[in-house]
């Protein structure tokens, strides 16, 4: 595994525990175990509960295994997409769980680890895969998709409403793109200088988000899992989802609202406290929604 020294700080840990309400003998499914921060906090808070942690990223799973090794009798980790969580639970002989946690953010390791391609801060290969066994990379997408399709992806997934076509055109003109800085250059050339100055975040943030979402099928996977999630919960079991942009949050909100088997616990998304944002600026865009499984609607 590559060198990595920066500590990942899990977002809204207090709120996660408050809404999940983990108890002894209960099973929590951590769908995005990442580096294990939330799972560790839950296991420390609740000495008798059990964690089933899953992630598609084999490298962060190794970090999680190290972080959770003292809880190895209560924490089981698996490399699998949360999209297939129902299959995993069936294989384990677990009919239903008592809590589901999803933290949809990119981990510090993915951002700061070498050669993952998620960052625009330094030169890396254009990868952006969370599952390193997947064949679709950002480089493949950027160099092979038609300009119109790239524009659609940047418009829809990056919410780049005004400049998606210009960015797509510059990407095509700059082909082949091989590194993250090649993509940054194309975006810089596409945007007017006043627009670059006006943006509060890095000017390439939206484009990187769009390509990452497309490469990893993030929205499709989220929709597919949330449709099944209510049937994986015992009555009284809770699902907690932390999202980091409006596309994800909208999917979570609408799924909870349309469900006949879930009672919404958060009418509005819960945001991190000012104190947490000061300590962990990446938490700023986090939005937490929670719901509880009810008997109504049947199985």
Curated annotation (Swiss-Prot):
CDD domains, per database record: AdoMet_MTases
Biased composition (Basic and acidic residues): 268-282, 289-299
Annotated keywords: Cytoplasm, Methyltransferase, rRNA processing, S-adenosyl-L-methionine, Transferase
Protein's UniProt keywords contain Methyltransferase: yes
Entry keyword Hydrolase: no
SUPFAM superfamilies per the UniProt record, alphabetical: Putative methyltransferase TM0872, insert domain, S-adenosyl-L-methionine-dependent methyltransferases
Cell compartments where the protein resides: Cytoplasm
GO CC term, one of those recorded: cytoplasm
MF annotations from Gene Ontology: rRNA (cytosine-N4-)-methyltransferase activity
PANTHER family tied to this protein: 12S RRNA N4-METHYLCYTIDINE METHYLTRANSFERASE, S-ADENOSYL-METHYLTRANSFERASE MRAW
Known role: Specifically methylates the N4 position of cytidine in position 1402 (C1402) of 16S rRNA.
Name of the protein described by the UniProt record: Ribosomal RNA small subunit methyltransferase H
Organism of provenance: Thermotoga sp. (strain RQ2)
Gene (UniProt): rsmH
């Amino acid at each position: 595994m590559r060198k990595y020294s920066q500590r990942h700080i899990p977002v809204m840990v207090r709120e996660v525990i408050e809404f999940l309400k983990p108890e002894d003998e209960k099973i929590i499914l951590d769908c995005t175990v990442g580096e294990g921060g939330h799972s560790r906090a839950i296991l420390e808070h609740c000495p008798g509960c059990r964690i089933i942690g899953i992630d598609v990223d084999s490298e962060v799973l190794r970090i999680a295994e190290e972080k959770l090794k003292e809880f190895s009798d209560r924490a089981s980790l698996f490399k699998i997409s949360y999209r297939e969580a129902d299959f995993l639970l069936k294989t384990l002989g677990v009919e239903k769980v008592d809590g589901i946690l999803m933290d949809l953010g990119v981990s510090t390791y993915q951002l700061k680890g070498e050669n993952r391609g998620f960052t625009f801060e330094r030169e890396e290969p254009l990868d952006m895969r969370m599952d390193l066994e997947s064949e679709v990379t950002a480089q493949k997408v950027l160099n092979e998709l038609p300009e119109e399709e790239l524009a659609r992806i940047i418009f829809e997934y990056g919410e780049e409403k005004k400049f998606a076509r210009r960015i797509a055109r510059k990407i095509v003109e700059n082909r082949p793109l091989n590194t993250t800085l090649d993509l940054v250059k194309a975006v810089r050339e596409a945007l007017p200088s006043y627009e670059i100055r006006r943006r509060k975040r890095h000017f390439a943030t939206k484009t990187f988000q769009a390509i990452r979402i497309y490469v990893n099928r993030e929205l499709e996977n989220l929709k597919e899992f949330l449709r099944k999630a209510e049937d994986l919960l015992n009555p009284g079991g809770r699902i907690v989802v932390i999202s980091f942009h409006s596309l994800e949050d909208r999917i979570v909100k609408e799924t909870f609202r349309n469900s006949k088997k879930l009672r919404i616990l958060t009418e509005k998304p819960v945001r991190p406290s000012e104190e947490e944002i000061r300590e962990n600026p990446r938490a700023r865009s986090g939005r937490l929604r929670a719901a509880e499984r009810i008997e109504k609607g049947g199985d």
